[in-house]
């Protein structure tokens, strides 16, 4: 009997759906979940964010950095 092939479950975008959080540059707690410990934006293939929402997220993170709500780099 052959072993059943392993299928990795497709991750769903955390920003799609009815009660999904809104991406806002003022919501630093939400944005920090998508920044690495070195201060870099985590890629969507790791966070499972859709391409459209990843662009929105990157824009919000960059805006928050510019307004000094988030650090550019962590020492």
UniProtKB/Swiss-Prot annotation:
The keyword Ribosomal protein applies. SUPFAM superfamilies: Ribosomal protein S18. GO terms for molecular function: small ribosomal subunit rRNA binding; structural constituent of ribosome. It comes from the Bacteria. It holds the Pfam family Ribosomal_S18. Keywords: Ribonucleoprotein, Ribosomal protein, RNA-binding, rRNA-binding. GO terms for biological process: translation. One of its GO terms (cellular component) is cytosolic small ribosomal subunit. The keyword Ribonucleoprotein applies. Belongs to the bacterial ribosomal protein bS18 family. Binds as a heterodimer with protein bS6 to the central domain of the 16S rRNA, where it helps stabilize the platform of the 30S subunit. NCBIfam families: S18. Part of the 30S ribosomal subunit. Forms a tight heterodimer with protein bS6. This is Small ribosomal subunit protein bS18. It comes from Ruegeria pomeroyi (strain ATCC 700808 / DSM 15171 / DSS-3).
């Amino acid at each position: 009997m052959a072993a059943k092939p392993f299928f990795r479950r497709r991750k769903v975008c955390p920003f799609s759906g009815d009660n999904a959080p809104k991406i806002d540059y003022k919501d630093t707690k939400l944005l920090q979940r998508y920044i690495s410990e070195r201060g870099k934006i985590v890629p969507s293939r790791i966070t499972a964010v859709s391409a459209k929402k990843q662009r929105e997220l990157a824009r919000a993170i960059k805006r928050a950095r510019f307004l000094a709500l988030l650090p550019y780099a962590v020492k």
